[in-house]
Amino acid sequence: QIAEKTDEKCMSIVDCICEDKYCFSNEKIFGMVVPTYFWRLPRIVAEYLGKLRIENCGYTFFLTSYGATTGEAGSMAKKIMAHNGQNFDAYYSVIMPDTWTPVFDLTNKNRVDKWLSDGKKQLKLVIGNIMSKRKGNFVDRKLYSRKPEL
């Protein structure tokens, strides 16, 4: 949805790794959208960020999706980028249903629909911020209530 609204292309990290594509330059907008995995970045994302080079891009952002909390995903991305002398212009988060089923019950359709609805609202705000090139850290680290009002 972000690529569609910003008229940009969408690439997977796996494809970038397979194509040995770690440098992005002169892009109008460069963003990464990744899941939070056990309150952290997935290892493949952390390793990719360690090799990533962003040069002369108009606006850069990092977005993490999360179930219960973003944990340290945003701060990990920021720390890895800083280690390489780089930074994203903005950091965002969007709620999604947590899929770790031993703990989170996904059988309640109303609850899942509520999480998806909240996520769509957050994504709409994020897209607006991206379009206006808003800078800052907008990652929500609060523990999301698993019992939303229905």
Short names for language-model regions:
Residues I2-D20, F24-V34, F38-L150:
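FMN-binding flavodoxin-like domain, especially the glycine-rich phosphate-binding loop
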